[in-house]
Regions:
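AAA+ P-loop NTPase nucleotide-binding core of proteostasis motors
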Residues: 1-346
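A short, hydrophobic C-terminal helix/tail in secreted or cell-surface proteins
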Residues: 347-352
Length: 352
């Protein structure tokens, strides 16, 4: 327009402005390419594995590791997290290793276990730590409280209600969770409280590693570890002990006596065909005062983190730890009194 109107001075200014903008555009383009090169967002194997894990429930990022390397340190890792149950952990890890090297039936679950022993000795805690180690997250633990299945009419909730009944659309509480998370630890807590029909449903899972839900879908359990916990026999130990009028000879004899009492109660409660399908029946020992002292350090780590989160720092001396262990020790109730002791102690400190 400026050239047509013979306004050459204005046309020259437009030309100079165009050159300036062209130079500036090239400079910005070079800067953008350099920044893009430095901050390039690449989608690699790890990101793809995370997305697949989120969508499918299959822990691909853990499977990508060498299976042997992942399992080599399992026993030591679990023994550091679960105190004074080395024999139980050794049995558990050996059974899992046998299955992972290809010696098990390919349709059988990775492992089927029953954890026996007094309350508060680490049965449920070991299942949680195993879920974190094997599948990389505590969310891989499917926990079902079997006290909710004490009545006959509640048994169908495990695989889903029949057509025409309330809750048919929801699916089974066990089958639906395993269908969504095929790689998981299935924890059936306090199994002795369940109705006997529950054991009949579990027979097929323990043997063939599959179960049919109310929609007719076959749910695959071959990539799960099934753990059942029970306090069976502990009441007899509490009521009768080792005898009247004399103390126990030593701790080894106590543990052997406890195992024999628990084994007798186990055989009375569960059918032989049910027990015969388990890979291992693992008995947990009662905790000693030395074990409680070690557990104090583990429990205090969580307390330290909570205190630091609100802007303070807590230091507990060795004498205080010994005091907490002595106050929180009860051979019949395991580590649970220790948690209450720590809670009451922290409450008293807050009041002061």
């Amino acid at each position: 327009e400026a050239v047509k109107s013979q306004n050459f001075e204005l046309a020259a200014s437009y030309r100079d402005r165009e050159k300036e903008l062209s130079v500036r555009l090239e400079e910005m383009k070079v800067e953008w390419e350099a920044r893009l090169k430095d901050d390039r967002q690449t989608v690699g194997e790890e990101e793809i594995a995370n997305v697949i894990s989120m969508m499918s429930g299959v822990p691909v990022q853990r499977m990508a590791q060498a299976e042997g390397l992942k399992l080599v340190g399992m026993k030591e890792e679990l023994q550091a997290k679960v105190i004074a149950q080395d024999a139980a952990i050794e049995k558990l890890t050996k059974a899992i290793l046998r299955s992972r090297v290809g010696l098990k039936d390919p349709n059988h679950p990775i492992g089927t276990f029953m954890f026996l022993g007094p309350t508060g000795v680490g049965k449920t805690h070991l299942a949680k730590q195993l879920a974190k180690y094997m599948f990389g997250s505590a969310d891989a633990l499917i926990r079902i409280d079997m006290s909710e299945y004490m009545e006959k009419y509640t048994v169908s909730r495990m695989i889903g209600a029949a057509p025409g009944y309330v809750g048919y659309e929801e699916g089974g509480q066990l089958t639906e969770k395993v269908r969504r998370k095929p790689y998981s630890i299935v924890l059936l807590d306090e199994i002795e409280k369940a109705h006997p029909d529950v054991f009949n449903i579990l027979l097929q899972v323990l043997d063939e590693g599959r179960l049919t839900d109310n929609y007719g879908r076959t749910i695959d359990f071959k990539n799960t570890v099934i753990i059942m916990t029970s306090n069976i026999g502990t009441r007899q130990l509490k009521e009768f002990g080792r005898g009247v009028g004399f103390a126990a000879q030593n701790r080894t004899d106590d543990n052997e006596h406890s195992r024999s009492v628990i084994q007798k109660a186990l055989n009375k409660t569960f059918a032989p065909e049910f027990l015969n399908r388990l890979d291992e029946i693992i008995t947990f020992d009662q905790l000693s005062l030395e074990a409680i002292t070690k557990i104090v350090d583990i429990e205090l780590k969580g307390l330290y983190e909570r205190v630091e989160a609100i802007g303070y720092k807590l230091v507990v001396e060795d004498d205080a730890k010994t005091f907490l262990a002595s106050k929180g020790y009860d051979v019949q109730f395991g580590a649970r009194p220790l948690k209450r002791c720590l809670l009451y102690t922290s409450d008293a400190a807050d009041d002061k």
